[in-house]
Amino acid sequence: MVRNLLDPRPPIPAAYRTDERVAIQQLARDFAMNKVLPIANRLDPERGLIPPSIRSEMGRLGFFGVMIPEKYDGLGLGVFEYALVAEELARAWMSVASIIARSGLAASLDPSQRAIYMPLAARGEWLGAFAMSEPDAGSDIASIRTRAEKVADGWLLNGQKMWCTFADQANCIVVVARNQPYDPAHRHAGIRQFALHKEPGAFPKGLSGNPIRKIGYHGWHTFELSFDDCFVPDDCLVGYETAIADDDDGFKRTAAGMTTPRIHTAARSIGLARGALEDAIGYVQQRQQFGRPIADFQVTRFKIAHMAADVEACRALMYQVAANADAGESSETHAAMVKYLAAEMSERVTSEALQLHGGAGYTTDLPIERYWRDARLTKIFEGTSEIMLRLVSDSLLPPTPLR
């Protein structure tokens, strides 16, 4: 009897399926598997960078402009389609799935600047970086110390930033800084966002950067940044009018802008896990031990079953949260839930897939170790798993005095 085997790459559920979504998912899948995966397998082990040709083709296919409005030459689609594309790209190389977020920073600029930069961003010709974390300020955004001092016609930035990925190649770095001294009694006050425009491949006067050596997330560099009287013009204070009127504007902007990135991280986590699952399904049917494929042994079959169920469950929640966001029912709590569950699942599934590969999985000859290394990061960036649990619990329980 011939059975139809479950495809680890299931179609979009009927409740969410449209011809447009099917088309963009297939477009991203074909590009990821045919163009990105072979390059990732070659470049990641040697810590090579994403080739400009890949970025150019991504721009031509519209992947940078998925959520950019059509009036700015984007596709004008939603979070759901963005998640579809991210999952497919992450299945091949998470760094490529991450770079599509770099165009979204153009939306944070003021209207006059959006009109200039968003059409470029939609084509992948203008990409940004985000400088928020500091040596002593990670999950606790309100504890940042980088200062913005008002001078004639602009601001001088001074301080340190950590974990600024793509800072060297970006056209603009959005910097989170304070325009007043840190006050423990008013921790959120005085936080602002500044758009520091720059030439790709260089740092402007007053800014220097040192690459951070990472165990994964290769394909681009992540920097520690030092600001030393780095000048930013007045019109590059993000949300100038509201920022002047509202002392908490910068903190609100930073915190409110995390829902879509967390859905994006869930999609990347699912893509990594799916890649590991697909590779494991193929490997266990080929690998022979004790005179038979290891896929014949129940322990192997149950591992595969658990992995597949985990991936499917997280994808289902991601679809729901993304669809709700597009319907104007965005929920910080549900975004935190899906980010937490998908990241934890991704580390677990990629680890199990590596286990099924045995010693071969612990080499750079196969991509499984890349999925495993990159999955570990999803529990840290865009809010750690612990912070996600804090957000969810705070929405379910009365406030705690430990705030």
Can you describe what each PLM-predicted range is?
Residues 158-207:
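A short core secondary-structure module
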Residues 124-132, 175-176:
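A short, Trp-centered hydrophobic/proline-enriched beta-strand micro-motif
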Residues 60-125, 165-172, 325, 329, ...:
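Internal helix-loop-helix
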Residues 146-149:
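A structural signal for short hydrophobic beta-strand segments in well-ordered beta-sheet cores
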Residues 162-168, 216-217, 260-261, 377-384:
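Glycine-rich phosphate/pyrophosphate-binding beta-alpha loops
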Residues 37-46, 281, 285-295, 308-341, ...:
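C-terminal helix-coil-helix/basic helical segment that borders enzyme active sites and/or dimer interfaces
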Residues 2-13, 84-85, 101, 247, ...:
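Glycine-rich phosphate/cofactor-binding loops in nucleotide/flavin-utilizing enzymes
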Residues 12-20, 24, 97, 207-312, ...:
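Glycine-rich beta->alpha junctions and the first turn(s) of the following alpha-helix
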